[in-house]
Amino acid sequence: MSMMFLALHISAFSQILVRGKVLDSVGAPLPFAQVQLYAHEGTTPLAATQSNPNGLFTLEVADTGIYRLEVHSLGYAEYLQEVVVGDAGELQLPTIQLSPSYEEIGSVQVEGERPVVRKGDSVVYQVGAFAKGNERSIGEVMNRMPGLYVSSDGSVSYQGWSVSKMMVGGTDLFGQGYGVLTNNLNPSAVKEVQVLENFEESRLLKRVRRKSERVAINLEMKDGAGQVVGSLEGSYGYRLMHRANVSLVGVWQGLQWSLLANSNTVGETPAHSWADPQGLNNIGSGEELSLPIPKPGSIEAVTSTQGSSAPLSASRRRRNLSHMVGFSTVLSPNRRFQLKANVVGQKEDDQYASGYRSKVKIGNLSFNRDEQSQKEVGSYTAVGRVTLDWEAYDQADLRYEGGYSFRQNQSNGWNEGQQNRLSEMGFSRWQRMDHTLLYTQSFDSAGLIRGGFEWQSQWLAADYSAAISGTVPRGLVGKQGLTASYPQALHTGKTLWLYLAPIAKGFTGDARLGGLYFQQSLLTRGNHNRSVAATLQQSDLFAGGAVNYTVGPVLVKAGLLAHTVRQDLEATLPSELPGKRLYLAEPSLAIVASTERHYGLLKYSRNSTTSTLLDVLPEPLVKSYRSTQQGSTEFRLHHGNTYQIYYSYANVLSRNSLQTQLYYNHNSHPIDTHDVIAASHTTSYIISGRRSSTLYASLNTDYYLGILNTTFRAAASAQRSYYTQNVNEWEIPLVDDYLTAEVSLRTHFHSIFDISVGADWRTNRLQSDGPVQLRHSTSAYADLQFTFGPVLWTTTIERLEPGVQKGNPNAAYFLDSEVQWTVLPQKLTLYISGNNLLNSNTYIYYSVDNLEAAYLRYDIAPIRVMAGGRWQL
């Protein structure tokens, strides 16, 4: 390791730093301005970067002399300046203030802007070119932009890369939990979606890493500094249904805030989840360097999973009442200090109803299920975070991040079987407190050190009970009922220190050193097993590094990370359980080739995890009234070898893109499971299994046909997994195939019509020693929109055929329609909407898993007819 440090340090060469700050026309810091440095008469930039959220930038040049500095930013006039670089090692430029770009054209009106443009490392999408006018969130519009894909939880990917941050006006308001912004910010106030490639928020990290593997998004609002923008929306309708939404963003010099609120009974979950804190993960300019912190386990009532996991959108299946409020603020009193604070609270009540009918035959085991279930669940979520960034001095930064997270769930359900009625109650309360201190020290030409300390504490109260009517047992539930409780506490400490070497003759690299310690306390209680108190301690020490070599557009990366892991378990058992130490190494090799339009990746990595000594406890843990889990029989290592090929193409100006991937994972030491299934009151069996390998391939493409103003989007994926399933004395090899295909087409003529059609197909094929089980799911939709002056009419027709067998059709039809009337342009819009207008009360879904094929009947959300209005500030 010391030789690696020495080699990286000796190969460094001296650089001259050119620093500056960019302001907008009112004197506020201007983020993401493109800054380029040319030779005095040159045409190719010698150095380029973009200003950070505080307007600051740093460029590096190798020689003294006279240069030309150019600064560009959308909406501002080009800035040119002659720069004389001496041999002082560093040059501080005067503050640069840009002027707005206006063009006097008399009475001539310029219609529209280019929908997509590239500015250096930024790709800018005009929201108006992709919005239809009836979207409820900016995420709906972004999902139509070429290269962008938005998940249901609000997370975004660009050209296959996960977006790490989403900012508003250059300010990061919600951190990694930006999904609440994607799903709740009204698009009517957003002018541009700016995708920032090679994004790096650390000003010091930019000095040693000119390129980053991170991607971020900035939402540029329609109004400038000193304004409050956003919208207020409300609707009310049939069966007392309602939807209300507040979406506000305020910007002043040195202060920015956002207020998001939502209350609805139309199936929306405003905050799907809250991302884990970044902590010390991925602090090295995009290199994958993550040590996941374990989470405590919980118990899930069976009636709580049926219905909530139905393969249908939430607005189609949920009977809900949801309330959410989120507030975030960023305060920058001076250029060296920034405070970010945000809080999100949510309350949800849900109702689901479903039926379950199946037949299982394994060897000489055979049993049937015929059950009807209903459940109610209530949940509370609260999250608060604070981040402090301090530029201690020119070559050092300090960051503190801390937060508190809370989630409570309570469910009540009943299950009507052939023998009797089963009642279930589940309760869980999870809390987490976390603190991270991150220090960054730059040594200019000698590289950079970055690292710190992280601490997390988690607490979980998990209780479960089940009872039957009568005396005939249901699974594990007898006449005495079933109770289980697993209170847990988990405390984790982590430290990581990273050295990043500067670039020298195409070579660079890093070295890393750190450790992780956690302690988990578990108390098992209930009438199915005796009480056991256990405390598990684990330490993980690791060291390693990576070397990168760049030649032209090709980058070769080789890395190695070595671990030593030890676990010790103390439990209230007659015999003492010894501790154990394991050693493991994780090599990786990647070859990357990239240009402005093309990106290719070949990668190999070895990933290792360990089981937990808690699994060797002789008392099994209750999972539900149907089963218990005993886990692995020993503390051991699990290996996985991953091979990946990835290619993407993006022609932003023509709005065409393509991403394709081939992924193979082979587990030489796969994970074991060990469950005891109480299938019925007369039948039980022991099941254990392991996954040995998975092959996955995918293709996504966007194609724009300009002559017809039509966008074509297609996606396909295929996955094959190999398993070995052991049921009592039988060993069953399984092959699981999963195929998907999606296609959509959108054509529109501005201000007259907008038509979208699409379809998708999914199939699951499961093959074992017995018969092949096969199911299909298909859907198709047509989305029609027409404009008649101030009136906008939208109608969506959808056909779903979920989980069907050949020759057994099972279609459900849905009709949604909305009429909008713009009373005051850019201000007031009134609308009447109807959802689920053609649906029946239930639909049937055919499901297959490793051993069981089942027919599930789900209730569908009722018809919704509502009237409302939206006021834009």
Where in this protein do the model-derived segments appear?
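Structural motif
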Residues: 19-30
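Membrane-proximal, glycine/serine-rich, low-complexity loop/turn segments characteristic
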Residues: 27, 54-56, 70, 76-79, ...
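Conserved C-terminal beta-signal and adjacent last beta-strands/turns
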Residues: 740-763, 773-873
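Face-selective signature of the C-terminal outer-membrane beta-barrel domain
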Residues: 330-348, 377-413, 422-571, 594, ...
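Short, acidic Ser/Thr/Gly-rich low-complexity loop/linker segments typical of extracellular
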Residues: 41-56
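Short Pro-Gly-centered beta-turn/loop motif in secreted/extracellular proteins
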Residues: 28, 58-66
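A short, solvent-exposed loop/turn motif at the edges and junctions
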Residues: 38-44, 66-81
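Extracellular/periplasm-exposed beta-strand and loop segments of Gram-negative cell-envelope proteins
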Residues: 301-303, 307-320, 351-360, 367-383, ...
